[in-house]
Amino acid sequence: MARIAPNEDSTMSTAYIIFNSSVAAVVDTEIANGANVTFSTVTVKEEINANRDFNLVNAQNGKISRAKRWGNEASKCEYFGREINPTEFFIK
């Protein structure tokens, strides 16, 4: 599965991963608002499934939001995410 770099896909926009009623990370994604996603700060290399490069470890579930109400909190957020598999984000 080929990945498109974020600057080559005009449909990507800034969104927030919401977890426990707060912003867990800021991400660039084309995933719809309200979609469930999985995120983690730890990954491991996938050794079995050739369609995946990495797997998340100790992952949490959150939701995607682009609501303006999260903007102020997101501006203070120090965590940024990158989609490593469909609906799975590695947080740095």
From Swiss-Prot:
The keyword Transmembrane helix does not apply. Keywords: Host-virus interaction, Inhibition of host innate immune response by virus, Viral immunoevasion. GO terms for biological process: symbiont-mediated suppression of host innate immune response. Changing I31A: Loss of inhibition of target DNA cleavage by the host Csy complex. Signal peptide: none annotated. The keyword Ribosomal protein does not apply. Changing A32G: Loss of inhibition of target DNA cleavage by the host Csy complex. Coiled coil: none annotated. Inhibited by phage protein Aca2 repressor (AC H9C180) both at the transcription and translatio levels. Interacts with host rRNA-guided surveillance complex (Csy complex) used to recognize the invading DNA; this interaction prevents DNA hybridization in the Csy complex. Binds to a the Csy spiral backbone. Anti-CRISPR protein that inactivates the type I-F CRISPR-Cas systems of the host by blocking its ability to recognize target DNA. Inhibits therefore the degradation of the viral DNA by the host. This is Anti-CRISPR protein AcrF8. It comes from Pectobacterium phage ZF40.
